[in-house]
Amino acid sequence: MANTSSAKKATRKIARRTEVNKARRSRVRTFVRQVEEAIASGDATLAKEAFLAAQPELARAATKGVLHANTASRKVSRLAKRVKALSAPTA
């Protein structure tokens, strides 16, 4: 239990930041899920649109410290690879 006023304030700040970060993380997951659903449906144009919407969300989460920069980069890279494979002609 926090005893000093500064520790109590820090606890309040942490609670507020946690709520903001939860919302951001949820938003990122939603965008990534939309891309994965579009890929699963096999619609290349829908997948590309969803990917283009998800990319800045992942970058924003990395900038804000919700995701590690390398994690966001890895997710973007893997999604891009899957979207590209979907639109590529099958040989």
UniProtKB/Swiss-Prot annotation:
It comes from Rhizobium rhizogenes (strain K84 / ATCC BAA-868). It holds the Pfam family Ribosomal_S20p. One of its GO terms (cellular component) is cytosol. Keywords: Ribonucleoprotein, Ribosomal protein, RNA-binding, rRNA-binding. This is Small ribosomal subunit protein bS20. Residues 1-23 are annotated as: Disordered. One of its GO terms (biological process) is translation. The keyword Ribonucleoprotein applies. Belongs to the bacterial ribosomal protein bS20 family. GO terms for molecular function: small ribosomal subunit rRNA binding; structural constituent of ribosome. Binds directly to 16S ribosomal RNA.
